[in-house]
């Protein structure tokens, strides 16, 4: 897989940070709508979601709400191009994340509510040189 990037606007980062802060100490989650052109995922809309788990170690998005978002994305001629969630630890995928990343091979943005750092990862079919098939991708911050 060639070097991937995900572009996010400053205003979208603010929404994700607010989502994480409001849910703390529990994990927060959001869906990222947009498009992919060649090696660039472009986020067009951030949709904060409710974490059904109300947990510090996991998140689950309600299936009915998830279906609504997929239909909404389709109506905008976009798709879900990323999943965001927060960790009350370092911003790296957990073992559970890795399992779901393989099922949903789109960018996963993870924010640490401890260090405030945000990183992005994706499951890669070509796992050579990557840990558990997970590859970090560049997060490109775009001015509004």
Show the residue positions of the predicted features.
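Conserved beta-strand-loop surface patch within small alpha/beta domains used
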Residues: 1-80, 88-144
């Amino acid at each position: 897989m060639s070097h991937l990037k995900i572009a996010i606007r400053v205003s979208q980062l603010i929404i994700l940070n607010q989502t994480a802060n409001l849910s703390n100490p529990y994990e927060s989650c959001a869906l990222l709508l947009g498009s992919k052109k060649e090696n660039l995922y472009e986020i067009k809309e951030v949709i904060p979601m409710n974490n059904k788990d109300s947990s510090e170690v996991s998140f689950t998005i309600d299936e009915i709400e998830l279906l609504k978002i997929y239909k909404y994305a389709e109506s905008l001629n976009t798709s879900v191009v990323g999943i965001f969630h927060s960790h009350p630890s370092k911003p790296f995928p957990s073992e559970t994340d890795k399992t779901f990343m393989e099922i949903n091979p789109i960018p996963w943005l993870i924010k640490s509510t401890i260090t405030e750092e945000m990183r992005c990862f994706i499951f890669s079919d070509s796992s050579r040189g990557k840990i558990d098939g997970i590859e970090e991708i560049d997060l490109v911050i775009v001015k509004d």
